[in-house]
Curated annotation (Swiss-Prot):
A GO biological-process term: ribosomal small subunit assembly
Signal peptide (UniProt feature, chain positions): none
Basic and acidic residues bias (residue ranges): 15-27
GO molecular-function terms, A-Z: rRNA binding; structural constituent of ribosome
Entry annotated with the keyword Ribonucleoprotein: yes
HAMAP family on file: Ribosomal_uS19 (MF_00531)
The protein's name: Small ribosomal subunit protein uS19
Native species: Alkalilimnicola ehrlichii (strain ATCC BAA-1101 / DSM 17681 / MLHE-1)
Gene3D superfamilies: 30s Ribosomal Protein S19, Chain A
Role description: Protein S19 forms a complex with S13 that binds strongly to the 16S ribosomal RNA.
One CC-aspect GO term: small ribosomal subunit
Keywords in alphabetical order: Ribonucleoprotein, Ribosomal protein, RNA-binding, rRNA-binding
Record-stated family: Belongs to the universal ribosomal protein uS19 family.
Amino acid sequence: MPRSVKKGPFVDGHLLSKVEKARESNSKRPIKTWSRRSMVLPQMVGLTIAIHNGRQHVPVLINENMVGHKLGEFAATRTYRGHAAGKKTK
């Protein structure tokens, strides 16, 4: 279920301040964050944000198509190595 329009998008305060600082200084360094629940805002477009997936920070370059989605959608938390191959007999 989507968030109420009157509440607006949720972004952690510390992440928003880091984004504003990076915008002011034209920094190209990735912004590390553990906040997977924060929504991608138009101010973040063009920045690289390193999103924590439980083990490491995955760098993600934010583009216009990502606006409105949650950061956690772009850093997979589970590794799938495929099903074990069946033993074939001749």
